[in-house]
Amino acid sequence: MTNIRKTHPLLKIVNHSFIDLPTPSNISAWWNFGSLLGFCLIIQILTGLFLAMHYTSDTMTAFSSVTHICRDVNYGWLIRYMHANGASMFFICLFLHVGRGLYYGSYTYFETWNIGIILLFTVMATAFMGYVLPWGQMSFWGATVITNLLSAIPYIGTDLVEWIWGGFSVDKATLTRFFAFHFILPFIVAALAMVHLLFLHETGSNNPSGLISESDKVPFHPYFTIKDILGALIFGLMFTTLILFAPDLLGDPDNYTPANPLNTPPHIKPEWYFLFAYAILRSIPNKLGGVLALVFSILILVLFPILHLSKQRSMMFRPLSQCVFWILVADLLTLTWIGGQPVEHPFITIGQLASIIYFTIILIILPTTSLLENKLLKW
């Protein structure tokens, strides 16, 4: 008798995705982040659901409702901190997942890569809207500054901003619609993640060597289910440590002050995971130029398959490209640091230099290094 998991219409899909899936035998721990991102999404949807049961999306009561969750709801403080820090863990996993894709040449799977970029944008939009909901000072001013960037779009900009706000400033209408979108977007993310997996399973996973692995594949279960569970346990340990020992480490103290449209905080800045893009935005004195640089700083990922000029897929055997890659990582960390600093003397120049280096590495240095390595192969 054939096993039910191979015949049942629903179980068959699960079987082909997580049990009998042929997987390259040499994929390293860098391939754990896909499952960890799924884990993060489940945590965020569940904690968000319980928070939404007690939250009110009204400018008068939003801040108080979050306080009420933390003080009066059973384990409300835990749910709130899981949700807030869950977003940070989500982005850590996202950045590592994208970095892995860049290092090992996974972007040559066009469809999977492009769906991944759409996923990244969707998660960023979700996180931004979620940051507005507690209606603290940084929530309000962050929403005002970031939505205002759309006014840089010629001709329709101002109308577009007022349309998004639902009025002439960030107010009740804005908060209500942001709550509605913040609630629905994670489910769209989940649907997109399934499409992402669908395209991935059409080609099979990449592996560290970047070579075709048809001749050396093992079933996903038990080998990689165990590996993913270990990854989830390590993730859980780090996550619980963060929540229980330093829950406010990655947050902004200004957000513990209720939103006040009459009082602007001295340094308006987004959450830490947007700081690199914020630094690129600020490094250009022109408003429209800054907005374009901000969007292109992430949209540039689309160009990686086109800019891949190397004869080898992975960077595993390309020491020069490895060097350039790690300089890019250091540059992104520099941009993150600059994004959190005030707009004054040394930081402005450092930010501008780091922004130039970021685009130069991706558009010029990496492709040139690839061509040089191709020459060295013949030498």
From Swiss-Prot:
GO molecular function: metal ion binding; ubiquinol-cytochrome-c reductase activity
Subcellular location: Mitochondrion inner membrane
Domain of life: Eukaryota
Residues that, per the record, bind a ubiquinone: 201
Entry-linked Pfam families: Cytochrom_B_C, Cytochrome_B
GO cellular component: mitochondrial inner membrane; respiratory chain complex III
Ranges that cross the membrane: 33-53, 77-98, 113-133, 178-198, 226-246, 288-308, 320-340, 347-367
Further details from the record: Heme 1 (or BL or b562) is low-potential and absorbs at about 562 nm, and heme 2 (or BH or b566) is high-potential and absorbs at about 566 nm.
Described function: Component of the ubiquinol-cytochrome c reductase complex (complex III or cytochrome b-c1 complex) that is part of the mitochondrial respiratory chain. The b-c1 complex mediates electron transfer from ubiquinol to cytochrome c. Contributes to the generation of a proton gradient across the mitochondrial membrane that is then used for ATP synthesis.
PANTHER family: CYTOCHROME B
Assembly and binders: The cytochrome bc1 complex contains 11 subunits: 3 respiratory subunits (MT-CYB, CYC1 and UQCRFS1), 2 core proteins (UQCRC1 and UQCRC2) and 6 low-molecular weight proteins (UQCRH/QCR6, UQCRB/QCR7, UQCRQ/QCR8, UQCR10/QCR9, UQCR11/QCR10 and a cleavage product of UQCRFS1). This cytochrome bc1 complex then forms a dimer.
Annotated protein name in UniProt: Cytochrome b
Organism name: Belomys pearsonii (Hairy-footed flying squirrel)
Lineage, uppermost ranks: Eukaryota, Metazoa, Chordata, Craniata, Vertebrata
Gene: MT-CYB
